[in-house]
């Protein structure tokens, strides 16, 4: 229930909880869950997909430590979603097809052990390409990203062959070369 509250405070939407116990499901709703489901329901994964518009959940916090629960989570997590293994899954009571359930959909499994927690919620490569471009252009606009010092020379596109040859063969190739298309003579 603490994980549920942290997720709520972090802005998880929709915030789904699954539990076999109806009293715990009721408590989860009081603590901020948008939907509390019974994982034993035959259509459980379908209920999750419906609640998420067919996408699946972006992040799962698996707190039971039961391998069957992890296997079930792999069926409703979104493509490129994350599953945090807060519960300690020690008994391999459910076979998991890592190729189909983890590799192909790009799911990230995170061992959430007290001793290996990240200090900050930032991981290399977590941003999208769009985020990278937007941030880079913002940094340029406010002068925090300097690109002019990275340009070694400006040349006519007619010298492209020479430029690429130098980039391939030079012991210390130029840092950056810009083609000035105004110099191009057709």
What kind of region is each of these model predictions?
Residues 1-42, 46, 59:
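Mid-domain Rossmann-like dinucleotide-binding core that forms the NAD(H)/NADP(H) cofactor-binding site
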Residues 49-50, 96-151, 162:
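C-terminal substrate-binding/catalytic core of Rossmann-like NAD(P)-dependent dehydrogenases/reductases
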Residues 58-61, 84:
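N-terminal Rossmann-like NAD(P) cofactor-binding module of classical short-chain dehydrogenase/reductase
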């Amino acid at each position: 229930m603490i994980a549920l509250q942290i997720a709520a405070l972090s802005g998880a939407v929709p915030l789904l909880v699954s539990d076999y116990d109806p009293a715990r499901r009721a408590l989860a709703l009081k603590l901020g869950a948008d939907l509390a489901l019974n994982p034993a329901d035959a259509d459980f994964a379908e209920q999750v997909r419906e609640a998420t518009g067919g996408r699946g959940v972006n992040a799962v916090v698996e707190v039971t430590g039961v391998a069957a629960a992890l296997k079930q989570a792999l069926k409703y997590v979104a493509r490129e979603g994350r599953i945090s293994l807060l519960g300690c899954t020690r008994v391999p009571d459910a076979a998991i097809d890592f190729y189909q359930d983890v590799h192909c959909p790009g799911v990230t499994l995170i061992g959430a052990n007290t001793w290996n927690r990240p200090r900050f919620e930032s991981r290399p490569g977590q941003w999208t390409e769009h985020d990278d471009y937007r941030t880079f252009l913002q940094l340029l606009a406010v002068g925090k990203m300097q690109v002019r010092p990275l340009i070694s020379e400006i040349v006519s596109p007619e010298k492209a062959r020479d430029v690429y040859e130098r980039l391939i063969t030079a012991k210390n190739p130029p840092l950056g070369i810009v083609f000035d298309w105004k110099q191009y003579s057709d």
